[in-house]
Amino acid sequence: MIFTIVTIAVLLMLFFFQRWYTSREIAREPYYPSNAATIYLYGEYHGKQEYLDKEFELWKLRYEQNGMRDLFIETEYYTAQMLNIWLREPDDEILNVIYNNNEGTLMHTEAQLDFYRKIKEECPETVFHGTDIGHIRETGEWYLDYLEENGMKNSREYELTKENILQGDKFYANGELDNAYRENCMVENFIREYDTLNGTAIMGIYGDGHADPSDESVDDNTHHMAFQLREHYGDIIQYESIVTLTK
């Protein structure tokens, strides 16, 4: 009798845990700006096959029908630069460096590799823009070595990579995650990249917690990335949740 009660209790706990875990992937409402959009953001939960498939479908559509070439992603500046080099290379050596260094993260999945490979095959003129802090120091150091070997130690790329690595060091300093600092860095990095494009329309893929310009919630007294970008650029950001689009 006691065993039966315990079994039922455990099953109920598992059921409600599953409901809670699934519910974290909220199907948020889209946001359409009052002005003509030039920044199209999609919010995701990282590493899931169905979400990455939808993201590729959306990017290919904008690439082919709208002529977009600039894809902003929630990764490091230097990782995006390496992806841009890899798009022109005949092999996957650089992609494998990125993938192997991402071991233990949500980006270390076959689905993520497939996403990049499909872009290389079907959208080869894509230009990646990475606007996150330097999470994976090893990848940044690889790119610094690459730049040095190619006579680019005094380049802007080298300077930005060093800055990006230091952003990551500060975020992880003393074993504490400074989320407000990261969010502000993501905003600064996004603005730096976007302002070089002179108003060209872009698509961006970010974690859902960063991507909604109508989300007024704060983390450590700091608004999330898209809300800050809306305040900076005005109402030109369109947002849709990949969770909603795959329902």
Where are the predicted features?
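Compositional signal for N-terminal targeting/processing segments
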Residues: F3-K247
